[in-house]
């Protein structure tokens, strides 16, 4: 089954890197949507089916934690795996993300292998994709 993925980051360059990495994972990906902040991401999720989200934590307007809380509060999106992306030293925010139900996290700067390993772990855990 092909998956629809949403990449959320305020940096267009990071979004492009994540899209390239996702295409290299070997996952059957139908569509990669993108958004520049949490509010945009909610709009994308309202308009399109999304099976997995990779989101930065630190963003303007609506940050990744606020976005994650909104996703988890929605019966429609509650089961969608959300992987958080954070900078070094973001332990407090990572802890909050895990408490809110994040499927995992990756630290910036990340490698393609780290993203692949995290997604493989989500697949092995049986999270719906």
Annotate each predicted stretch with a short phrase.
Residues 12-33:
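Two-component/phosphorelay signaling modules centered on CheY-like receiver
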Residues 34-43, 64:
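Helix N-cap/capping motif at the beta->alpha junctions
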Residues 56, 86:
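Active-site residues of response regulator receiver
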């Amino acid at each position: 089954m092909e998956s629809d993925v949403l990449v959320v980051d305020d940096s267009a360059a990071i979004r492009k890197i994540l899209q390239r990495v996702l295409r290299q994972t070997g996952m059957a990906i139908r569509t990669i949507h993108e958004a520049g902040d949490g509010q945009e991401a909610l709009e994308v999720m309202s308009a399109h089916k999304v099976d997995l989200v990779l989101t930065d934590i630190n963003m303007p307007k609506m940050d990744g934690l606020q976005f994650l809380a909104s996703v988890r509060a929605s019966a429609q999106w509650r089961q969608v795996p959300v992987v958080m992306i954070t900078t070094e030293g973001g332990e407090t925010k990572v802890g909050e993300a895990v408490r809110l139900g994040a499927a995992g996290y990756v630290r910036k700067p990340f490698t393609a292998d780290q993203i692949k390993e995290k997604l493989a772990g989500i697949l092995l855990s049986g999270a719906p994709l």
